Amino acid sequence: MSPIRGGILHLPPSHESRYSQSLERGLAILRAFTPDRPWLGIAEIAEVLEMSRPTTHRYASTLVALNYLEQGPARKYRLGMRAGDPGRSAVNSTALRKLSPHCLGDLRDRSACTASLAVLNGSDIVYVDRARSLWQSQSEVSARLGRGSRLPAGHTAMGRALLAHRSPQEQREAIDTGGDQCVARAASTATGKLLEELGRIREKEFAIADQLHVEGQICVAAPLRERSGEVIGAVDVAAPKTTFSRTRILERLAPLVVASAEEMSAHLGYTPPR
């Protein structure tokens, strides 16, 4: 008989004294979430793990409090910020990668800037794809970025566009655990001010990062939505500050990025509310 039944590992008596069943059950709940079932209710989790509903609810409530799970509509749960959201990120990356060659290439050509696409994974963004500009010189830092590269979400335009649509708890978690790289010198990265900025980004639907990660580079990003309206990724362009003034950014690049994000969201099945 397999030692794993209902997602729970059953050890022989000789090992039980060194084994924490509570920890194992908590981890089993996290493992119950997969790319095919990103949202689960208490009854579904209890059935998968063969646990009682009261016990499952107690563990789930603890995981929510610790930000390993988050509770959404209809009392469903999904992996939270601290869980790293591997299942959801994998699904999002796959769906977005199918769109990226055409859409990113088109955005790059229209903006004459390098265009990128990323998803949120824990407190970082993970690059899904990039379309590099043939006319724009790349800094050493920017040139190293490619598929799979990670950056602290709060330090990037795409990260801020994504965090703007997460819960306040998740926003603070990402900011607190995002490290203190080169952006520490920018006053706008103070936690309180950044949280306020995320609120403004949510309203205007695009984010601007002025030399936050790469010296001399301004990035403009907008969120991508799937069919349900959930923000699952972000797209951006990276422009040299010597070429693009802030006025030109707002009047030319921001509308291009937002339009590209809307086009990609439509391909993902999203229809804006009327």
Please identify what each model-predicted range represents.
Residues 2-97, 262-270:
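N-terminal helix-turn-helix
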Residues 78-177:
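Amphipathic alpha-helical effector-binding/dimerization core
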Residues 99-107, 175-221, 266-267:
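Short, basic/aromatic recognition patches
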Residues 224-227:
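Sensor-regulatory modules in signal-transduction proteins
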